[in-house]
Design a protein with these regions (language model features):
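Terminal low-complexity/charged segments
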Residues: 1-159
């Protein structure tokens, strides 16, 4: 049995009405929740004894604008690069995608329980925005700035 299974069960019990998607891969749990629930869930993940994710390791943004597209258009032929190994006769998007374009992904570490957790929320507003977690983890300051600079995702409440 994986070491992450007991944590998976505790997360599922605690956030049964909040979790939209839950997976486990390579002994690391990934949760997807709505952006509206972010601060409530993060506070519980940080403070509750069953979780104790006191360390925010990283925040990144994923741009799903071309997710599932197996080929990109070019204006000229090339003997090198990705496109020469792809069959262009098929459909353009090989994986259907019906979610928002940008996701903000938080990576946490519980030193007490020696567990890692990935939490994903989609920025559904336009322009893309989610709540800032800087009040819970001051280290979020630079991660949120970088996400804004690179992707334009706005973190509401960021100083």
């Amino acid at each position: 049995m994986s070491a992450s299974v007991p944590l998976l069960q505790k997360l599922n019990q605690r956030f049964v009405d909040v979790i939209q998607e839950m997976t486990i891969a390579l002994d690391e749990i990934s949760l997807e929740i709505s952006a509206e629930q972010l601060l409530e869930v993060c506070l519980a993940l940080r403070d509750e004894a069953d979780f104790k994710f006191e360390l925010l390791v990283d925040i990144c943004v994923v741009d799903y604008s071309d997710y599932g597209v197996s080929e990109w258009e070019t204006n000229r032929a090339s003997l090198t690069g990705f496109e020469r190994g792809v069959d262009n006769s098929g459909e353009q998007r090989s994986i259907p995608w019906h979610k928002p374009r940008f996701a903000v992904v938080y990576h946490f570490l519980s030193l007490v329980h020696n567990q890692r957790l990935r939490l994903r929320v989609f920025a559904t507003a336009e322009p893309p925005q989610v709540l800032s977690v800087i009040t819970l983890w001051p280290a979020a300051n630079w991660y949120e700035r970088e996400a804004f600079d690179l992707y334009g995702v706005f973190f509401v409440g960021h100083p």
